[in-house]
Amino acid sequence: MFGTLRIGSEKNSVEFIEHAKGEAASRLGGYVFSHSACESCRLKKLRCSGHKSGCDRCRSQAMKCSYQIGAPSNSSRPKSRSHFQPNFSNMSGTAGTSKAPSPLGNDGVDREIGGWEMAETDPTGSVVTTTAQFLNSVNQGEHSNLNDLRQGQRFGGELDYSENELNDIFSNIAYLQPDDMETNVFVGAANRAVLDAEAFDSMTEPANSMSDDIGDIAASQPPSADVQSAFMAFDHARTSSSSSSHQSSDTSASDAFIATDFDGARSRTDPSTCQCRGSILRVLAEIESNILSASPSNMYAILSYLRQTTAASNDILTCRICNCRLKFFGLLGIIGEKITSLSGAIITAFVCRLKEQNESVDFGKSDSPDKRLDPNRAIQLCEFQVQSLQEFKVVSAAVIKLQLKYSVAFVSRTRELAISMNHLAQAQSLEKLESRLNELVIKMQRMVSEVDSDLCDI
């Protein structure tokens, strides 16, 4: 097979389109796409050909949608390749080692990874970049704006709460009932309004250590210099508020991941300063290893990574100086899947750690409603310690539930973007992820409430 029949805009207008030649053909199996078909064309099993007439309902009109001929066979009848249904790499919610499917199918035809449109429209109208090519080219350092990325960033220690934040928590923790957790644990500036998932950007912005790579955030959620909350503790590298502003010039490149000038980031208007592509790469490069490494001993460190990953991904959705959310929409869907898996891994780690803490309780004081933890097993929070089992359960569960709400917000916004792009199949898959995250929220509430139950079974 050497070409594709294109059905023209006029009835009975059929043209023969040659396949791509040379390097592009070897990479994409002879099919070059720089186009995202509309849902109607997808349902009709239409694919784009090489003429720039364009379907007026498609996202990109650089290519014309037409019937695509399948691989050669004994039959002379043309065959249209069936649509590959959405299928994320791992919907089980557990840590896995499965790799993304190859962009080339057995028939040598370009295939969307997981059913997501992976084609990027090149601004020059030349050759498209598929997901596999993008990751490969970035890993080879072809993009200068990624040279200073710190790969495999790890966070050590426990949550770094400030003294005031801990006082607010601990002053409301004695004899606290699980049902009152959200109402009473986070007080002061971190009030109920901040707990709302829609306040995601304004709450996490002061601690969002990835914002320097992302740039502008939606104007609908302006920054608040007064917002201080326990969730700011997730920036492990900061030991004081002053260290979150400007870093010295000799360490600015390596510490850009940790410290950010947020005012400068929000004032950017030049698309060349956008680092969304780099942020997407960093998340994809690190998140799987964090899923695999989640354990009771590093539960807070992994939770910290999840918060920053969710914040960075959310900012990509709201960035106004680039359209990476459209070009790499499929990757955002994969990130949503991985965020769901990582959330499940964190809850599993919480359950195991809760059991460990329960076993370490000083049973000589078991009659006390505020059972004391073994001093050697107590949790260090900055210069303070969570010294009772109830303190550990309430604080940990509150923070995890709060993070789950932000993860739900990200997946929900990605689903809304899919609907706006007319990617209905992808929106349905994201809706399943959103439901899974909501189930995890319910499980967290139930685990905290069922004090005497077997917490190993989630």
UniProtKB/Swiss-Prot annotation:
SUPFAM superfamilies per record = Zn2/Cys6 DNA-binding domain (SSF57701)
Tell me, what is one Gene Ontology molecular-function annotation carried by this entry?
A: DNA binding
Q: Which Pfam families match?
A: Zn_clus (PF00172)
Which keywords does this Swiss-Prot/TrEMBL entry list? Answer: DNA-binding, Metal-binding, Nucleus, Transcription, Transcription regulation, Zinc
Aminoacyl-tRNA synthetase keyword on record: no
User: Which residue intervals are the DNA-binding region?
Assistant: 38-65
Q: Which PROSITE patterns match?
A: ZN2_CY6_FUNGAL_1, ZN2_CY6_FUNGAL_2
For bias type Polar residues, the affected ranges are 71-100
Question: What InterPro entries does the annotation carry?
Answer: Zn2-C6_fun-type_DNA-bd_sf, Zn2Cys6_DnaBD
Residue ranges of the region described as Disordered:
69-109
- Please list every transmembrane segment annotated in the UniProt record, as residue ranges: none
The entry's localization annotation reads:
Nucleus
Q: Which GO terms describe its cellular component?
A: nucleus
**Known role:** Transcription factor that specifically regulates the expression of the gene cluster that mediates the biosynthesis of PR-toxin, a bicyclic sesquiterpene belonging to the eremophilane class and acting as a mycotoxin.
Query: Under what name is this protein listed?
Result: Transcription factor ORF10
Its organism's taxonomic lineage begins at: Eukaryota, Fungi, Dikarya, Ascomycota, Pezizomycotina
What gene makes this protein? ORF10
